[in-house]
């Protein structure tokens, strides 16, 4: 076993000893929040981990990388990468009883940048994640009507036909791009604020504030609904989906394995990235949540339970999604065939009912033989069920276009629409609880807010400030900004944070010390699996994924898809290059958080080198006192 531990002077003065830990827990029982029960804690963690990405990212990756074959690297990396880091975050938060900023500052003052980066990433993700929730609320509000507003095109101003943009695309496309986003044709064309979206964004932040106003005291009550209702809705959709025509075709298509994909490095890279992001690791929220546990809570068992639920949910959601996609593909296949049948009937004046899907090819042959010239004038569509099933859609396109189109073809469509968007709302809201925790707690640890200010005020100021910045997402170009942040702002920083977390605990805090801490908390030392993954396997996997991600993102040109009615292949999305100034934006939103970690470490090094020996001794004494009083200031 690797036993390298880097020098870390003063560590014992910055953290509580195991003997003092239980005493401090009793003393802070009245001042520090704690969970009402174990179920409340687990539901909160599950709600934070299981988010919108499980709904619209995992099914797409399965479909793109060999169906059932993708499950193999996903499950392997879930065990070797996801569970070990989850256990580490649970254990270190429970042991040091602080948020992310306090935890890493306690381990080493130079690691404060890790906590700061987690806070910045949580802030950026919350910034655009709640915008998605506002879109979900807009669709939810519009679901309480019959027919659904995206089921048919609106009439033009003269009432003589449909709006041209809708007629050339589809009702679901038109409602999403024009009625909802009123999207521009470029990220440079900002346009104006869409007031309906602004009101929905205000509602989203207001709901989040009410749910997080007192931290876990309020979120702990809400998660009983937000973390369980999605599973109820998913089960209802699965039962309904399996009764729809073509549902099994979608499920079979999803899980039909293409084992050749296992030899594709991109498949393993995407599986590793999906495991990492689906656990919401490195945001700091899980560390804060675990810090509210009892000292002797079994964090090892918690990490396994949450991991199993998360992995099961990803697969379960994929089955539900593709049962509906199978139904949608079958409907489109039937519509395509009906159009071809109608073309053949009209071209040869055949009696209705004489041509069916079963005899269509034979009737084509007969018509071609009887009048080749007339047959040559007919234009038939290509109807292939696999092509409809293979239309890989992820992200907002899956939720707001593909699924909404499928819902319009279901009986009692408003009911299914309401259920679907309530489910998405709960998934998004419960994930935002963790993001808010990852911002509020570090700000409290930084002491930038006067201690006399109540937590309700701090939470309100954060929600208000983020809401004001979120105005950019209500512009005509808002969707492009959101996609930009989602694609480039958080991936690299999160991977860097996760690697630093694992390295810091194992080689700065010391894995042997960590093992003793866990033995004290749960009654036994971590077994050989945890030792191997923490010391070697998990850091190596994260480093490989980080390097690959960095190489891919740096080497590729920044492009994005736009909705352009003037595009010659409309309604297909047009892919264009980002303007040059976007590169500067990407460097700022991705580079600043990433560079915070080494920058703060260098700052501490320079500061320590410039201090006089007497000042250093005084600093150690101060840190020791602050550590015992629970008031670390670095």
Curated annotation (Swiss-Prot):
Location relative to the cell: Membrane
Residue stretches spanning the membrane: 42-62, 66-86, 121-141, 193-213, 222-242, 269-289, 305-325, 414-434, 457-477, 488-508, 532-552, 582-602
Keyword Membrane assigned: yes
Topological region Extracellular: 63-65, 142-192, 243-268, 326-413, 478-487, 553-581
Membrane topology, Cytoplasmic segments: 1-41, 87-120, 214-221, 290-304, 435-456, 509-531, 603-634
Signal peptide: none
Cross-referenced Pfam families: SNF (PF00209)
Membrane topology note: Multi-pass membrane protein
Gene Ontology MF terms: neutral L-amino acid transmembrane transporter activity; symporter activity
Glycosylated residues in this chain: 158, 182, 258, 354, 368
Catalytic activity annotation: L-alanine(in) + Na(+)(in) = L-alanine(out) + Na(+)(out); L-cysteine(in) + Na(+)(in) = L-cysteine(out) + Na(+)(out); L-glutamine(in) + Na(+)(in) = L-glutamine(out) + Na(+)(out); glycine(in) + Na(+)(in) = glycine(out) + Na(+)(out)
GO BP terms in the entry: sodium ion transmembrane transport
Cellular component terms (Gene Ontology): apical plasma membrane; brush border membrane
Keywords for this protein: Amino-acid transport, Glycoprotein, Membrane, Phosphoprotein, Symport, Transmembrane, Transmembrane helix, Transport
Tree of life domain: Eukaryota
Phosphoserine PTM sites in chain numbering: 17, 627
InterPro entries, A to Z: Na/ntran_symport, Neutral_aa_SLC6, SNS_sf
Family: Belongs to the sodium:neurotransmitter symporter (SNF) (TC 2.A.22) family. SLC6A19 subfamily.
Subunit structure: Interacts in a tissue-specific manner with ACE2 in small intestine and with CLTRN in the kidney. Interacts with CLTRN; this interaction is required for trafficking of SLC6A19 to the plasma membrane and for its catalytic activation in kidneys. Interacts with ACE2; this interaction is required for trafficking of SLC6A19 to the plasma membrane and for its catalytic activation in intestine. Interacts with ANPEP; the interaction positively regulates its amino acid transporter activity.
Purpose: Transporter that mediates resorption of neutral amino acids across the apical membrane of renal and intestinal epithelial cells. This uptake is sodium-dependent and chloride-independent. Requires CLTRN in kidney or ACE2 in intestine for cell surface expression and amino acid transporter activity.
Name of the protein in its database record: Sodium-dependent neutral amino acid transporter B(0)AT1
Lineage: Eukaryota, Metazoa, Chordata, Craniata, Vertebrata
